[in-house]
Amino acid sequence: FVIAAWDFDSMSRLPSDASVLIIGTGHTAVDALFHLTQQAQPRTITMLSRHGLLPQPHRLNPNPPPVGQYPDYVGEAPLRMRTLVHQLRQEVSRQANSGGDWRDVLNQLRPHTPRLWQALSLAERRRFLRHAVAFWDVHHHRLAPQAADRLKSLLKTEKVQVLAARLLAMHGTANGELNIELRQRGQQTAQTLKVTAVVNCTGPNTAIGPSSHGLLQQLVEDRLLTPSPCGLGLQIND
């Protein structure tokens, strides 16, 4: 059966020998993993996402990030994603050569992310969401050092694995298990994973569409609200 990300009671009721698929590899998925592996004999866990990326760790006792001006190396609008990624990598290398850390670059950039977003065209925003947002998220939204250490220890066991794969289908079986059809990244053929339960940690659905709340649908039909063209909630003026 499928369990919501925050339904810890249902997770706790799973047998100690259960095999569980966690859909997602972000913070919510890590929380679910920690809950499922609290017992002395942890369950067998597979974490799955398109890229198989896990959140990066914070540093222990980092210096407070400096609050500076808009970085000169970024440039002004209109920005292109390819150019911006190249500039960020150059800045990371420059700071690393002088004893800095990639986290310093992102910390300095954090107050200016709204301005960066506004400087991207609609096509470039969609390109970011399609190709780069997974990499941005794991570096921007980091784990506490203690949580990162616990995650690292779990990944060294044979009980936890992370897959970069696409979920194709899910079928129930006569004995109450689930057959998960997936295709790993870079592979042409699909494979089947048999699990006891699935925990959905994909996060909120920000796109406003036919499956949205009735009130939102009605407001859109009445032209009182406009969905974001990027699928990020509502279109706003700034």
What are the language-model segments listed below?
Residues 1-238:
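Flavin (primarily FAD) cofactor-binding/catalytic cores of flavoenzymes
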